[in-house]
Amino acid sequence: MVMRAIDRAVKDLLSTETGGGGGATMPVEKLARTQALFLFQIIRLLDGDVTLRAQGERDIRLLEVWLNDLCKVRENLRDLGAGSGTSERNSVGRRNQHPPQWETWIFAESVRRTIIMAHSFLQLYEMMKGLGSGSSNSSEAEDDDRGVWDYTHRWTLSRHLWEAKSSFEFERAWKEKPHFIITNYAFNHFLQNGRGDDVDELAEILLSVYMGVEETKEFITAKS
């Protein structure tokens, strides 16, 4: 029953893109469809059921295409320097700027976070399958990984901004709390200057990938 429900939901999602309506055109629609397919992919690829996994692997390429579409509408914080040496200055500088509209920032950050989380998941899945570590497809897999991570994917590490419940809370956190612009998995500056209280759920997941689960817990506890 669960398998049928998932299969039907995915088919409904894909039919909206291939039907006569022309598919998603607005940025919010592109974000919604990508997040929906991403969640279905997590279920199908990690469930352990052979049929679900085969269906999920069939749609990996489609998820990548939709992620590329999201990259085209993403505000990638290009005004900030990518090097870690400029991160502290940029954080202070941004706090001195007038904060963006709360709803606008939430949408833009959702796009940025969806992109880096989905790409990270797809790479992790390939690693779990053994690609890139001696299999016959290792060269192709490594080329794909370089293609994804050759691009700069920036996102904002700040629990205070991400968990703000109102425009007032957001503006106050923007002015009073540090927020760190992370490029891909470049956490060095944050680990030197950030605090455990800055870490939200996504940041904890990505930090765990970067430095290990226990090390991340220790950092959050020690620097809170």
Segments from the language model and where they lie:
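C-terminal effector modules of eukaryotic transcription factors
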Residues: 2-10, 51-224
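C-terminal transcriptional activation/regulatory domains of eukaryotic transcription factors
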Residues: 1-48
